[in-house]
């Protein structure tokens, strides 16, 4: 795996965030390592819309406490359903998840390109329920569609970040969801 951080050493990173619990320890680590972080909330997969609003508001609350900027994209669940059409019955970590990651990370890469931010990463890589291989594949594919943006395929589960995530979740009293987000993942945590 190429370590893009050693190649370009950016001061700015656009971090795609799925939720506050997954973002907290990552944001702490990035701040400790002197990165300037802008958050991007684009998660059209989350269902129902009320769940989407809860997760978004938790992230906005936490970002506000940290003084961070959040680029908040529109909720486009119908577009997401079209994007994953035909993959509804896939298991978690299957083809539907890969397509979902591609959609969200492509949107992230496009925002980074417009904002001239050289690197994107995602909090999806902190979840033990998600495939790091799929996330990396989707991230690399997404940045190949734009110019001047690289994908940082960091494993946010290592170096004590999983344990720190649990601590920050409790300290901040975050809402902690029990499924990834889409209606197809609600009862399929296999």
Please provide the spans of the model-predicted regions.
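Nucleotide-activated chemistry modules centered on ATP-dependent adenylation/adenylyltransferase
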Residues: 2-190
């Amino acid at each position: 795996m190429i370590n893009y951080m050693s190649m370009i050493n950016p001061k700015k990173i656009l971090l795609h965030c799925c939720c506050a619990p997954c973002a907290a320890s990552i944001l702490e680590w990035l701040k400790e390592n002197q990165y300037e972080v802008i958050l991007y909330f684009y998660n059209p997969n989350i269902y129902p819309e009320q769940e989407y609003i809860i997760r978004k508001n938790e992230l906005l609350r936490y970002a506000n406490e940290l003084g961070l900027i959040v680029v908040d994209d529109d909720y486009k669940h119908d577009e997401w359903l079209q994007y994953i059409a035909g993959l509804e019955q896939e298991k978690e970590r299957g083809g539907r998840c890969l397509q979902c990651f591609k959609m969200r990370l492509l949107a992230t890469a496009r925002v980074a390109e417009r904002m001239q931010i050289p690197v994107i990463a995602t909090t999806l890589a902190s979840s033990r329920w998600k495939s790091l291989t799929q996330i990396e594949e989707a991230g690399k594919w997404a940045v190949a569609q734009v110019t001047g943006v690289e994908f940082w395929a960091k494993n946010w589960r290592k170096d004590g970040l999983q344990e720190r995530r649990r601590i920050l979740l409790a300290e901040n009293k975050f809402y902690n969801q029990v499924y990834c987000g889409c209606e197809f993942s609600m009862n399929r945590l296999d």
